[in-house]
């Protein structure tokens, strides 16, 4: 039971949380939310919240530049290794030489290696609900939500984050989920085709219905669905490992890595710097597995 697991982790880490019933305390705390009366919720306070991925990436790139990194906004087509190190050749033909390379390219990571990694690339859909200004203000206290669905025919669970202002200046409430019948993409061409579309209309419609049931009376200007790919490893923990003397990999967030990306990156960076594992968790838990 994921709620019991979360409760135990919270107690182990002294997190500030309470267990609330949907038909009692939860409805008083968040009157705009609706769940089945039998539902139980773990409400975390303190540092709980969400990560804005655009701001996170921008902050990481800014700090990297301040520390002397050079950002080259190109895709790598292939890696070649020789006695002098590694050459990364971009899709425009630019060669970049390095003594060591860390591959952290998400769903694309395994295809830069001679031996493919055992990665499962799930094609999923997210839904953005555009909100008028008054509605965004009404929902300003909306928490981040993870909601396990017992009997839904399409979705096993959903997550949602509070309304955010996006680069187009509009405010959106985002919801995504876990499908009961998973759709996988297996090649780079399949991923490209998937990202050129609008996602799965069946999943998008299911997300819309769950959102409107969870937030009765929600005022929405427009809905739009977006494609996404989530990468899973064979053991459902990230691969953070050394492939050979010059190539390392950090890949497979398993749907849970955005909020942990700074620390996962630090683990990988220390591994590259030390030319071996240097962390207080067992290396074998993050070992790569090949297809």
Give residue ranges: language-model regions.
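Flavin (FAD/FMN) cofactor-binding and adjacent substrate-gating region
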Residues: 1-68, 72-73, 78-84
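A general structural signal for well-ordered alpha-helical segments in protein cores
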Residues: 3-6, 23-26, 57, 172, ...
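Short, glycine/charged-enriched secondary-structure capping and boundary segments
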Residues: 5-7, 86-87, 115-118, 188-190, ...
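Surface-exposed helix-capping loop/turn segments at secondary-structure junctions
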Residues: 6-9, 13-18, 68-69, 98, ...
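Mid-domain beta-loop-alpha active-site segment that forms a flexible
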Residues: 43-62, 106, 203-210, 253, ...
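Predominantly flavin-linked oxidoreductase catalytic cores and closely associated redox partners
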Residues: 49-135
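Active-site substrate-recognition segment that forms the wall
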Residues: 100, 107-245
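C-terminal catalytic lobe of FAD-dependent flavoproteins
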Residues: 208-291
């Amino acid at each position: 039971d994921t709620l019991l697991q979360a409760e135990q982790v919270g107690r182990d880490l002294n997190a500030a949380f309470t267990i609330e019933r949907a038909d009692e305390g939860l409805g008083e705390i968040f009157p705009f939310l609706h769940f089945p009366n039998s539902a139980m919720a773990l409400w975390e306070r303190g540092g709980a919240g969400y990560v804005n991925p655009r701001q996170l990436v921008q902050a990481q790139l800014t700090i990297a530049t301040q520390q002397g990194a050079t950002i080259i906004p190109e895709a790598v087509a292939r890696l070649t290794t020789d006695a002098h190190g590694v050459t990364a050749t971009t899709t425009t033909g630019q060669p970049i030489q390095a003594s060591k390379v860390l591959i952290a390219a998400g769903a694309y990571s395994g295809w830069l290696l001679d031996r493919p990694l055992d990665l499962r690339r799930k094609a999923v859909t997210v839904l953005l609900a555009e909100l008028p200004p008054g509605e965004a203000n009404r929902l300003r206290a909306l928490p981040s939500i993870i909601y396990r669905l017992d009997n839904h025919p399409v979705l096993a669970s959903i997550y949602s984050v509070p309304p955010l202002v996006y680069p187009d200046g509009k405010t959106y409430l985002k919801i995504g989920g876990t499908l009961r019948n998973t759709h996988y993409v297996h090649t780079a061409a399949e991923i490209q085709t998937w990202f050129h579309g609008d996602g799965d209309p069946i999943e998008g419609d299911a997300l819309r219905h769950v959102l409107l049931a969870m937030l009765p009376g929600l005022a929405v200007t427009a809905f739009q669905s977006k494609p996404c790919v989530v990468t899973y490893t064979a053991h459902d923990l990230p691969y953070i490992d050394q492939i050979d003397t010059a190539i390392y990999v950090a890949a497979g967030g398993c749907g849970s890595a955005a909020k942990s990306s700074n620390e996962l990156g630090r683990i990988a960076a220390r591994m590259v710097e030390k030319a071996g594992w240097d962390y207080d968790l067992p290396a074998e838990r993050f070992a790569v597995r090949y297809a």
